[in-house]
Structures are given as C-alpha cells and as structure tokens.
UniProtKB/Swiss-Prot annotation:
NCBIfam families: L6_bact (TIGR03654). HAMAP family: Ribosomal_uL6_B. GO terms for cellular component: cytosolic large ribosomal subunit. One of its GO terms (biological process) is cytoplasmic translation. The keyword Cell inner membrane does not apply. This is Large ribosomal subunit protein uL6. Part of the 50S ribosomal subunit. GO terms for molecular function: rRNA binding; structural constituent of ribosome.
C-alpha cells in the first residue's frame, strides 16, 4: 500500500466536496477547483467526513496513481482554504518589474520590455521593483507561471543576475583568471 495514498484526507470546515463518479470538485472560501481522477482509482467519503482514496489492485500504474491522486486532492483542499504563493526576487543592474493592470512587465536587459499575462486564477503582487509574488488557489498553475517567469532570465552562475525564487541559492562559478 502507498504510505501517502492510504492516509485519509481531512476536510476542514467551510470546504464542500462533491464526488461525481471520477470527478472531484472542491469548493472553499477562496474558490472552486475540480479534478478528474484516473480510471482505476476511486475516491470515497469515509467516517468522520474524511476522504479516502483507494485502488483496486497492486499493479505498478495503480500504485503510482494512488499516492498522486491523494496528494492532488489534498493540494486542492489546501488551495481553496489557504491558497498558494511563490515569492520571487530580481537581481541585476537595471533589472526590474512593474505591474501593468493585472499583468507584469519586466526589464531584463533585453532591447524590449517582456510582458507576462496573468492566467485565469493567478494574481501578481509587486512589493518593490525587484520583489514580487505569484499567488493563486491552484498549486500547479502557481508553480507553472513561476517557472515561466524564472525562465525569462535564469540566474547567471558568474554574476548572479536574473530572476530567482525567494531563498534560492545560486551556485557561483569562478571567472577566468587573467595572465
């Protein structure tokens, strides 16, 4: 049995869960998320209103989907109650970010500004020209848009310039030595 998969999922008060066949819908104070569960995995309401994820047998695919499904549903519940946020920082001379409505516009040393549109359900908050955050209720979307922004100008190993996640440690390389 998957150690993660066999743990029941606690449902906090204020969260409404609807199970319709293979579709699980989670509604909370911050919004609604839905997920389609892969075919052999079943989600049921157990005792004390907790959710239980079960698999029919121990085939390799079913074992891997078991823990994954449980974690995805737990992330949905946390998303609609607390939400997710990734803080990011910009290092480098002249590198900055500014809010343009609900979107962001980056100056990253290119000859043109780089715009980033906020997908549905994602909000950007600019704290300073070099610090901003990405937040939303869907953990996957928050991580995906953060990775796209990070990829616009990855941290340089020689000078450390670029966009980083808050707390990210950039391994620095030693430059060439002159004669």
């Amino acid at each position: 049995m998957s150690r993660i998969g066999k743990k029941p999922i606690a449902v906090p008060s204020g969260v409404e869960i609807t199970i319709d066949g293979q579709h699980v819908s989670v509604k909370g104070p911050k919004g609604t998320l839905t997920h389609t569960v892969a075919e052999p995995i079943t989600v049921t309401r157990g005792e004390d209103g907790q959710l239980e994820v079960t698999r029919p047998n121990d085939e390799r695919r079913n074992r891997s989907l078991h823990g994954l499904t449980r974690t995805l549903i737990a992330n949905m519940i946390e998303g609609v109650t607390k939400g997710y946020e990734k803080k990011m920082e910009i290092f480098g001379v002249g590198y900055r970010v500014q809010a343009k409505g609900s979107n962001l516009e980056f100056a990253l040393g290119y000859s043109h500004p780089v715009p980033v549109e906020a997908p549905e359900g994602i909000t950007f908050a600019v704290e300073s020209p070099t610090k901003f955050s990405v937040s939303g209720i869907d953990k996957q979307k928050v991580g995906q848009i953060s990775a796209v922004i990070h990829g616009l100008r990855k941290p340089d190993p020689y000078k450390g310039k670029g966009i980083r996640y808050a707390g990210e440690v950039v391994r620095r390389k030693v430059g060439k030595t002159g004669k």
